Every structure is written in C-alpha cells, then in structure tokens.
C-alpha cells in the first residue's frame, strides 16, 4: 500500500478544494434581508421586458411573461441580490422591468419561486417567507 495520492485522487481532491473555496454560492453574494415593500396600488406588469427584449435569452421569456401576470405579488417582494438598493428600484418587479433579472440568478430564482408558489395558491406573506428562507 502506498502513502501517496495517485493522479485521479489528487485531481479530485484539488477540484473539491477549489470548488469549496473559489466557487461561492449565490447566497454568499446575497445581501441581508430587508423588509419587503408594500405593493403599489394599481401596479401593472406593463413595464416588464417582453420577448423582443429577451431575444438573446429565449429561455427567460416564459419567466418574464409569468412575472408580468402577477405584478401585485412581485412588487411586494424585496430582491436580495442588492439591485433594489438604489432608490429608483422599488422591488423584485423592478428587476424584471429594468433588465437586471436578465443576468441575475438571484432575481430569476426569486421570480421562479414567486410564480410557482402563487400558482399553488400561496399568499403574498407565504411567498415572502419562502423567499426569505431560501434567499434571505
């Protein structure tokens, strides 16, 4: 029996170490949870990016279309990636209006979760709690 690592074990150990140290999870970049905003009266999904603005990201079209259908829910959710920190950005809905959600996995993840839970009949408070548990 030898006391040294063969090449396969060495590369496996190196890969695991690099992954643990260098590849941070999305949650590592998420900011501490802030209070969720109150959905604005009369808010619509009219400003959510449409398929023509997502031509280079066709896999996101259905997500943006789904967000457009539930603006009163998504406008009541704080985005945990930090994009709603500038004063002109109010809620997770803002991320889908200004295009931040095109490239941000946290915005997309929160949006997908909100759409799924809303489809299951969950209330805004239940959706917020689930988002806080996963992303907060």
Language model regions located:
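Mitochondrial intermembrane space
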Residues: 40, 45, 90-91, 135-136
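Short flanking/linker segments adjacent to small metal-binding domains or redox-active Cys/His motifs
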Residues: 124, 128-136
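Immediate flanking context of iron-sulfur cluster ligation sites
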Residues: 64-79, 90-99
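Iron-sulfur (Fe-S) cluster-binding segments and ferredoxin-like electron-carrier domains
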Residues: 85-120
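Short amphipathic alpha-helical segments that mediate assembly, nucleic-acid/protein binding
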Residues: 7, 57-60, 124
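C-terminal segment of N-terminal export signals and the immediately downstream linker at the start
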Residues: 24-62
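N-terminal secretory signal peptides and thylakoid transit peptides that target proteins
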Residues: 1-21
């Amino acid at each position: 029996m030898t006391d040294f690592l063969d090449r396969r074990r060495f590369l496996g150990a190196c890969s695991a170490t690099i992954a643990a140290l260098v590849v941070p999870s999305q949650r590592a970049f998420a900011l501490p949870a802030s209070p969720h905003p109150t959905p604005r009266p009369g808010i619509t999904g009219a400003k959510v990016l449409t398929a023509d603005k997502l031509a280079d990201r066709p896999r996101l079209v259905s997500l943006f279309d789904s967000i457009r259908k539930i603006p009163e829910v998504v406008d009541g959710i704080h985005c945990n990636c930090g994009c709603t920190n500038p004063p002109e950005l109010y809620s997770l809905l803002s991320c889908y209006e200004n295009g931040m959600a095109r490239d941000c996995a946290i915005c997309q993840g929160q949006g997908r979760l909100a759409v799924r839970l809303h489809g299951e009949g969950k209330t805004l408070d239940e959706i917020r709690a689930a988002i806080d548990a996963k992303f907060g």
